[in-house]
UniProtKB/Swiss-Prot annotation:
Residues 16-224 form the START domain. This is StAR-related lipid transfer protein 4. SUPFAM superfamilies: Bet v1-like. GO terms for molecular function: cholesterol binding. It comes from Mus musculus (Mouse).
Amino acid sequence: MADPESPWSQIGRKIKLEGLSDVASISTKLQNTLIQYHSIKEDEWRVAKKVKDVTVWRKPSEEFNGYLYKAQGVMDDVVNNVIDHIRPGPWRLDWDRLMTSLDVLEHFEENCCVMRYTTAGQLLNIISPREFVDFSYTVGYEEGLLSCGVSVEWSETRPEFVRGYNHPCGWFCVPLKDSPSQSLLTGYIQTDLRGMIPQSAVDTAMASTLANFYSDLRKGLRKA
């Protein structure tokens, strides 16, 4: 859970009470937080999982008692298509095997919304289905795009799901300099799954989930 003094802990209430004027400042802070993650030196990361086309690293999170994960791999598609498949929209459920539902609860502008999504159980249901309510923001970054998000406090709950919490997370996607039809996709994820789960199960699930994310996304892009 977020530190009570963390600026992220009251984001949901701020969005509801202060409206769009505050959403702009939240968007900027979220973007800057992800850019800070993107500038973390290589020697601070430890490899958590490495497969043919994806590497996943981790380091202790500064937001909660868990890990910040970094994942990176090359996608055989242009930036806009890659990000359009990741951010809230019609394509995400077509390819993401972990996600079971996605609804936009509030739409602020074209690139900014609050969404609710659910995920399937993992590790033979040691990790039961989860629900997340996230503020999502997509913005230009260098020659590409950044799609980022953070969980918000939302009063409506559903008893069949455990409410998880995403600390600031996001996906940087930029064209390869020598092959602009391909994109380098780099993700930063720090999810508090909450509930009574062994930490070893969380660590196994997170690294595998990120590797599978790239595999599933590649398949989805080929079908598009």
